[in-house]
Amino acid sequence: MIRLENVSYCYPDGTPALTNINLTIRKGEYLGIIGRNGSGKSTLALHLNGLRRPQKGKVIVKGIDAGDFSKLQEVRKIVGIVFQNPETQFIGRTVEEDLAFGPENLCLPPTEIRKRVDRALAEIKLEKYRHHSPKSLSGGQGQCVALAGVLTMEPECLVFDEVTSMLDPDSGETVLRRIKKLHEKGKTIVYTTHNLEELHVADRILVMDRGRIVLEGEPENVLSDPSLKDLGLTPPSLIELAEQLKKHEIEISWENTSSPSSFAEELCRLFLKT
């Protein structure tokens, strides 16, 4: 669906942000991208819908060159992006006005705009906030409004750039559940974060460091890789605990490291068995 070919990009001071990135994002997959601050993951995310253009190489979105300025509108119909701070995306005085902004720019008829707004409000469970100011909502609710706004454009791929980093744990969980449901309905998801705890549900994970992809694979392999600490990343606590238990011949299955409750249930089952 999206292909990056030898993509390189430098900051204005000449510091490399991306160096020779080659990557294929498959339709319908959930791709997690992790790395410490300054690793290049956000810069990579911005290249996926043309908000950044490569200084070398190409980004191809369903056969369209995302670096071609004349094709940007087509690219952004396919790939939508939600940022860390939702307020940067708010335009309207009310939630429904904000959601209508994108479809209006596509010059869609009013009946189609109304359908898309209503559908997005229902999808993200925001109907009761329809007439509220988006800026009056909590951080988690605001992030859901930003997500709903992108959904009105009906993109095939959704890019989430550190969307839970400014949220409390409960709000972050709400947003992650919404994203998971969208993936289950067929959306392609690209999710950047420095919090490895959030990527258990991904199909594939990339680890970035200093503008390069240094590790890639399925979550089970990447999240337990001993090199993560050398890259400034903290492995998920339950996976670390499972690794410690393994040394004592207590095997916790990968599926049961996804949440404290499932981990505890598996541990109890193993002890009762003995």
From Swiss-Prot:
Similarity annotation: Belongs to the ABC transporter superfamily.
Transferase as UniProt keyword: no
Topology with regard to the membrane?
A: Peripheral membrane protein
UniProt keyword annotations, A-Z = ATP-binding, Cell membrane, Membrane, Nucleotide-binding, Translocase, Transport
Gene Ontology molecular-function annotations: ATP binding; ATP hydrolysis activity; ATPase-coupled transmembrane transporter activity
Identify the InterPro entries for this entry: AAA+_ATPase, ABC_transporter-like_ATP-bd, ABC_transpr_CbiO/EcfA_su, ECF_ABC_transporter_ATP-bd, EcfA_1, P-loop_NTPase
Q: Which Pfam families match?
A: ABC_tran (PF00005)
Q: Which SUPFAM superfamilies match?
A: P-loop containing nucleoside triphosphate hydrolases
Q: Which residues form the ABC transporter domain?
A: 2-235
Q: Where in the cell is it found?
A: Cell membrane
User: Which principal EC class is assigned to this enzyme?
Assistant: translocase
This protein's GO CC annotations: ATP-binding cassette (ABC) transporter complex
> Does the entry feature the keyword Cytoplasm, yes or no?
no
What is the predominant subcellular site recorded for this chain? membrane
Write down what this protein is called: Putative ABC transporter ATP-binding protein MM_1037
Give the EC number(s) under which this enzyme is classified.
7.-.-.-
According to its UniProt entry, the function of this protein is described as: Probably part of an ABC transporter complex. Responsible for energy coupling to the transport system.
- SMART domains linked: AAA
Q: Which positions are annotated as binding ATP?
A: G35, R36, N37, G38, S39, G40, K41, S42
- Name its species: Methanosarcina mazei (strain ATCC BAA-159 / DSM 3647 / Goe1 / Go1 / JCM 11833 / OCM 88) (Methanosarcina frisia)
